[in-house]
């Protein structure tokens, strides 16, 4: 499979398919620092990034906001002193789409 960071998000409509269990197992291996959470019956990807202070956490949040706008796919973001919690899921399908894995990989790339 092509590296997730090289892929672009595709438009995700309400009738788009969620990832299958087999796809989930394959894709999650490509983003090993991410976990799967279920909230209100909706599967989501989540990762907590640690930083030395609030300023660095906020700078990361701003870079992530720019990426989200470029890809037109937006995460849940909780910015706190020394950490940023990022949650990806596709609102229109109430679950996980390949776009979420692409964006998780691209989020990790922001640390480079």
UniProtKB/Swiss-Prot annotation:
Top EC class for this record: lyase
Residues of the signal sequence? none
**The keyword Transcription regulation is assigned to this record:** no
The EC number of this protein is: 4.2.1.96
Listed A to Z, the keywords are:
Lyase
InterPro entries, sorted: PCD_sf (IPR036428), Pterin-4-alpha-carb_dehyd (IPR050376), Pterin_deHydtase (IPR001533)
Report the superkingdom from the record: Bacteria
- Extract one GO BP annotation from the record: tetrahydrobiopterin biosynthetic process
Which GO molecular function, any one, fits this protein according to its record?
A: 4-alpha-hydroxytetrahydrobiopterin dehydratase activity
Q: Provide the reaction this enzyme catalyses.
A: (4aS,6R)-4a-hydroxy-L-erythro-5,6,7,8-tetrahydrobiopterin = (6R)-L-erythro-6,7-dihydrobiopterin + H2O
What family is this?
Answer: Belongs to the pterin-4-alpha-carbinolamine dehydratase family.
Instruction: Identify this protein by name.
Output: Putative pterin-4-alpha-carbinolamine dehydratase
